[in-house]
């Protein structure tokens, strides 16, 4: 459509330079500069074609995007320019903003440099198999963290890629935002998941949580990452059916990224510092969202002092999930009794001081409590009261079991 306009501009504006992004012979009969590598388009920040730019002494003074006849006439000073054309056409998206290649262009021309050591593969090597053979995976295939993918991941945060977030245990290696992004790529995260990965890493690498201790124990435990806030819905986290299972990208890849970071950067590999005797599948990923909107109770985050509008991450050291079955209880007291009986057996029924638990209620059980107007605090207190037991029943040797608490706790 703009060929006649370009031809006329070439005649009346001798200093005009025409750039073409794809066909170097376009437009016919007009001398043009090929921009097949899109360098000129990238540096000129071209969003739409055609774009008409005026420069004075190398500095842009004005531009118009797409075809708006009145603006082209005003900028060029040609009163009858494009008389045969429609008044307005929006133009087409520039190839330099094509989602399939924009990350490659950012690496080539964006001036941003990745500082992590790059590993080159031989042309005959299978990149997925090499990631296995070099020990970069958790036993499942990982996404190769190309510079383009890492740059795309970094777009998920405004933090400086070279900011040191923590010293990653167990080897206490400087963990930068860039290295977090690399492992998030490998885990399969989208850029919008990156802030959640960063928050979880910041949480587990505190003295209070002590991820080094979680790794070094022989117990089958791993970080359980519980997410709250409107951001969980924005990124599509699962807080409903199959909440602890497979099938949700955000849940699985956020948790997986955290595990890969501790393995690949911190050095927490199984059989080395990671001394778990059995482990459990949650050591691949154990991350889920609470149903903030559907729950009849105060959310975990709010109960811990946060506002419901805030996005939060809570981390807990947990073993694999276990099922609590009670299909008959219709009174809250009955259901609380069931929960107490099941919780009493966590790890060992005679070691009540040693272990904590996270209780995840499904809608049916939650409804029993809600219909009785029990608050979150009431549910916890009722279960706690039912977990009391005589010290004589849990000391070492009682009930024919050597395990138990010390004799000093006997009544």
Annotate the PLM regions.
Residues 1, 19-21, 360:
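Conserved beta-strand segments of the P-loop GTPase G domain that flank and frequently precede/overlap
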Residues 2-14:
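Typically the conserved alpha-helix immediately C-terminal to a functionally engaged Cys/Sec
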Residues 48, 53-88:
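Non-catalytic, surface beta->alpha helical segment in thiol-disulfide oxidoreductase systems
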Residues 108-411:
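Non-transmembrane, aqueous-exposed alpha-helical and coiled segments at domain scale
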């Amino acid at each position: 459509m703009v060929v006649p306009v370009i031809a006329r501009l070439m005649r009346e504006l001798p200093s005009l330079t025409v750039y073409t992004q794809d066909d170097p012979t376009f437009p016919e009969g007009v001398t043009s500069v090929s921009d097949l590598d899109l360098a000129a388009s990238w540096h000129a920040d071209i969003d739409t074609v055609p774009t008409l730019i005026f420069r004075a002494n190398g500095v842009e003074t004005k531009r118009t995007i797409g075809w708006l006849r009145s603006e082209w006439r005003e900028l060029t000073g040609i009163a009858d320019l494009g008389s045969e054309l429609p008044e307005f056409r929006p133009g087409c998206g520039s190839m330099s903003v094509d989602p399939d290649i924009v990350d490659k262009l950012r690496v080539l021309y964006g001036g941003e440099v990745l500082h992590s050591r790059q590993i080159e593969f031989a042309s005959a090597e299978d990149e997925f198999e090499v990631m296995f053979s070099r020990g970069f995976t958790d036993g499942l295939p990982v996404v190769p963290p190309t510079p383009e993918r890492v740059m795309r991941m970094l777009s998920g945060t405004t933090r400086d890629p070279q900011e040191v977030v923590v010293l990653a245990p167990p080897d206490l290696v400087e963990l930068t935002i860039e290295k977090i992004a690399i492992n998030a790529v490998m885990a399969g995260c989208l850029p919008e998941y990156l802030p959640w990965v960063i928050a979880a890493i910041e949480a587990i690498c505190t003295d209070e949580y002590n991820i080094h201790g979680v790794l070094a124990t022989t117990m089958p435990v791993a970080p359980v990452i519980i997410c709250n806030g409107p951001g969980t819905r924005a990124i599509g986290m699962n807080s409903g059916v199959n909440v602890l299972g497979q099938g949700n990208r955000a849940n699985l890849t956020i948790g997986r990224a955290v595990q890969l970071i501790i393995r690949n950067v911190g050095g927490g590999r199984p059989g080395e510092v990671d001394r778990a005797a059995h482990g459990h599948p949650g050591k691949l990923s154990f991350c889920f969202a609470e149903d903030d909107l559907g729950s009849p109770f105060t959310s975990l985050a709010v109960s811990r002092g946060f506002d419901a509008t805030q996005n939060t991450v809570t981390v807990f050291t947990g073993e694999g999930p276990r099922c609590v079955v009670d299909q008959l209880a219709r009174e809250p007291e009955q259901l609380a009794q069931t929960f107490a009986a099941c919780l009493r057996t966590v790890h060992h029924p005679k070691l009540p001081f040693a272990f904590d638990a996270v209780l995840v209620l499904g809608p049916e059980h939650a409804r029993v409590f809600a219909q009785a107007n029990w608050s979150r605090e009431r549910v916890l207190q009722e279960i706690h009261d039912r977990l009391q037991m005589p010290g004589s029943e849990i000391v070492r040797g009682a009930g024919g079991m050597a395990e138990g608490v010390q004799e000093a706790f006997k009544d």
